[in-house]
A protein has these predicted regions:
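Acidic, Ser/Thr/Gly/Pro-rich intrinsically disordered interaction regions
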Residues: 1-37, 98-211
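Extended aliphatic helical segments
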Residues: 13, 19, 44-46, 54, ...
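Short linear interaction motifs
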Residues: 54-60, 91, 95-104
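Generic structural signal for short, solvent-exposed loop/turn connectors between secondary structure elements
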Residues: 1-2, 54-57, 85, 109-110
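Short, contiguous, well-structured surface segments enriched in hydrophobic/aromatic residues
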Residues: 24-53, 63-92
């Protein structure tokens, strides 16, 4: 992950203090505080999003490292979404329908939605899962085993146990290069937001010139 992307983005935000002036009281809300929070947390996690920090071993230490890797991606992605909503003034999120990153899906879903499943099973709440694991329209309850490498086809895996006696466990595999690609694609979206900031700043300055 290129640390220069967030550095350039922060420089663009802080240029001439115009983003501060525009967003510290926008439609009755202090969006400047959200912008600062998002930038700060991207700074915190970006260097941890590196496959050198994870291991394919089947032990507790590797499980914690993968958990940290996934949660750092999640924090970065949530921050980018917040920035997108503010600067584009929309409730939508980027890459909503993209499906090209995760090539080993257990069920069909967008990359954004499938990452939520990965986050839940490997990090956020593995003992309380409710998702479309078998591809059916109706969600089902599952409970993840410990995560580890070497017991399925992926770099890292969990077994998903069902609460139904007649249903077998499923394997959910993840591949570190796919997770990194997911992260890099969304992190690079900061460049698109930067372009929007430049346009907004020009509009703001032109509006004052016309007064």
């Amino acid at each position: 992950m290129d640390k220069e992307i967030i550095k350039r983005f922060r420089d663009e935000v802080n240029a001439q203090d115009l983003v501060l002036q525009m967003y510290r009281n926008y439609a009755g809300k202090n969006y400047w505080n959200i912008i600062c929070s998002a930038m700060d947390w991207i700074d915190v996690v970006v260097e941890m999003i590196d496959i050198k920090n994870v291991s394919k071993k089947n032990d507790n230490d590797s499980s914690i490292k993968v958990m940290t890797f996934i949660m750092c991606i999640d924090v970065m992605w949530e921050a980018v979404q917040q920035l997108h909503r503010i600067f584009f003034d929309t409730s939508t999120i980027p890459f909503a329908d993209n499906t090209e990153v995760f090539c080993h899906k257990l069920f069909q879903a967008s990359d954004n939605d499938y990452f939520k499943t990965i986050r839940a099973c490997f990090a956020a709440h593995p003992i309380n899962l409710n998702d479309h694991f078998t591809g059916n329209k109706q969600k089902e309850r599952r409970y993840a085993s410990w995560s580890g490498g070497g017991f399925s086809s992926g770099d890292f895996s969990v077994m998903l146990y069902s609460n139904q006696p007649d249903k077998d466990a499923l394997f959910l595999d993840i591949y570190f290069d796919e997770l990194l690609k997911f992260a890099e694609q969304r992190y690079a979206y900061l460049n698109t937001i930067s372009t929007k900031i430049v346009w907004q700043r020009e509009q703001y300055l032109n509006s004052w010139k016309s007064i």
